Design a protein with these regions (language model features):
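N-terminal beta-loop-helix "entrance" segment that forms/cooperates
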Residues: 37-57, 161-167
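Short internal beta-strands
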Residues: 27-39, 153-154
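Glycine-rich adenosine-cofactor-binding loop
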Residues: 2-25
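ATP-dependent carboxylate-amine ligase catalytic core
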Residues: 142-179
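Phosphate-bearing ligand-interacting subdomains
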Residues: 46-110
């Protein structure tokens, strides 16, 4: 099997893993890396979410250990799976991967976007703090005023127990309080 490492920030990396690699027996995900969010490194992506190919879960390692991790784990391919960084930062990570003999990959939208039979509006931005949540709330209110049914989907986030939060539905403010 091909050994890969997923560079992430505890969100899109998990999403990409779930959609592309979770059930692929030809691939072994050696680890996720953690960047941007403190307190994530040292944890594991839980086996309940990682699936039967990963009965011990998947380690989450600090991105600063990238070069050593690639050598130690004999990683053949590095998959970049987060945003909010400059082109120069992405290319720096690519250079580290290539210097260690690994391929560097960005997954395209055909493999990572959720399929829907309904119309979809994506709210994205170049970095954290740009107002994605506020924009999504504004759009939701506008669409509801037009009589449409609205649902908001977000990729997994690392706050709390990932296994217990595998699927969360917030239909009312009380649902937020219960979470």
């Amino acid at each position: 099997s091909r050994r890969i490492l997923i560079l992430g920030a505890a969100g899109r990396d998990f999403h990409n893993f779930n959609l592309v690699y979770r059930d692929d027996a030809a691939v072994e995900v050696a680890a996720f890396t953690a960047a941007q969010i403190p307190g994530i490194a040292g944890r594991r992506y839980p086996p309940e979410l990682a699936g039967p190919l990963y009965p011990q879960g998947i380690p989450i390692v600090d991105e600063q250990e990238l070069a050593a991790l690639l050598q130690r784990e004999r990683v053949q391919q590095v998959v970049f799976a987060y945003s909010d960084v400059t082109h120069a930062h992405v290319m720096h990570l690519a250079s580290i991967a290539l210097a260690q003999g690994a391929d560097f990959l960005l997954l395209g939208p055909e493999r990572t976007q959720l399929q829907s039979r309904l119309p979809v509006i994506a709210v994205s931005a170049v970095r954290t703090g740009c107002g994605k949540s506020q924009t999504a709330r504004w759009l939701s209110r506008l669409l509801k005023q037009q009589g449409r049914q609205v649902a908001v989907i977000r990729h997994p986030m690392p706050y709390g127990d990932l296994a217990q939060q595998a699927v969360q539905r917030f239909a009312a403010r009380a649902d937020l309080d219960a979470a």
